[in-house]
Amino acid sequence: MIPGEVITPETDIELNVGRETLKVVVANLGDRPIQVGSHFHFYEANDALQFDREAVKGFRLNIAAGTAIRFEPGQSREVELVALAGKREVYGFAGRVMGKLD
């Protein structure tokens, strides 16, 4: 092994296997691009994004860690979300939950 070397399996690595997911259509009604990161509580995303907020409470984007999705002004697209795991407590972000989800 070489210091810093990363050895990965030859097969694809599946993310969030067995976790609850849902698909939602999101529209950017604003006049500026909006980017949402992989671990942002989607329910608390920018108010210029239009979607069923109650349906996505407790979910985040189902994309690789450290990545994001950009919504251009006037753009509408379908995204897949995955349920938050662990204690299912949310603090910070836009301050709309500040506690337990369930």
Curated annotation (Swiss-Prot):
One of its GO terms (cellular component) is urease complex. SUPFAM superfamilies: Urease, beta-subunit. Its EC number is 3.5.1.5. Pathway: Nitrogen metabolism; urea degradation; CO(2) and NH(3) from urea (urease route): step 1/1. InterPro entries: Urease_beta-like (IPR002019), Urease_betasu_sf (IPR036461), Urease_subunit (IPR050069). GO terms for biological process: urea catabolic process. Keywords: Cytoplasm, Hydrolase. It comes from the Bacteria. The keyword Cytoplasm applies. Coiled coil: none annotated. GO terms for molecular function: urease activity. The keyword Phosphoprotein does not apply. It catalyses: urea + 2 H2O + H(+) = hydrogencarbonate + 2 NH4(+). It is found in: Cytoplasm. Belongs to the urease beta subunit family. Heterotrimer of UreA (gamma), UreB (beta) and UreC (alpha) subunits. Three heterotrimers associate to form the active enzyme. This is Urease subunit beta. It comes from Acinetobacter baumannii (strain ACICU).
